[in-house]
Amino acid sequence: MSSKKILVADDEAHILHVVSMKLRNAGFEVITAVDGEEALELCMAEKPDLLITDFQMPLMTGLELCTRLRGQEATRDIPAIMLTARGFDIEPEEMEAARISAVLAKPFSPREVLQKVNELLAPAGAKAGAEQA
C-alpha cells in the first residue's frame, strides 16, 4: 500500500494512541493533534489524504474543524471521519454541510476505523468493483 497520510485529532490520549498505532501498523503515515486548532493548522500545512477527528475537542469541535476545512481550496476535498459518543446529536444537515464522510460512535474497534479508512481511500475503480461484487 502506498503511504497515505492521515491526520488523527482527539483529545483523549488513549484513543489517539490506539487509532494511530492501528493505522501505522497498516502502513499509513500518521500525524496527530490533540485539539481542533492544532488539527486545523496541521491540515493546512500537511494536506493529509484523510482526517479522523473527534467531535468534542478543546478549542474547536470536529464539526467546526471540518466546516472550516471546507472553506479552504487546499483542504476542501479531504475526506473526514467523525469519532463521537454523541453521533445522534449531529444533525444530518450539519454533517452534509461539513461534508463528513463517515461517523463512528464510541466505543469502536480499531478494526472498524481501519475498514472505514480503507473504504474512503480506495481508488474509484476499486470502489465500483466492490459495489458490483
Language-model region placement:
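Charged docking surfaces used in two-component/phosphorelay signaling
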Residues: 17-25
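Acidic, metal-coordinating helix/loop segments flanking the phosphotransfer/catalytic sites
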Residues: 32-50
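His-Asp phosphorelay/catalytic-motif detector in bacterial-type signaling
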Residues: 47-49, 74-79
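Active-site T/S-Asp motif of two-component receiver
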Residues: 52-54
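Receiver (REC) domain active-site loop signature in two-component systems and cognate sites
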Residues: 57
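C-terminal output helix
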Residues: 108-117
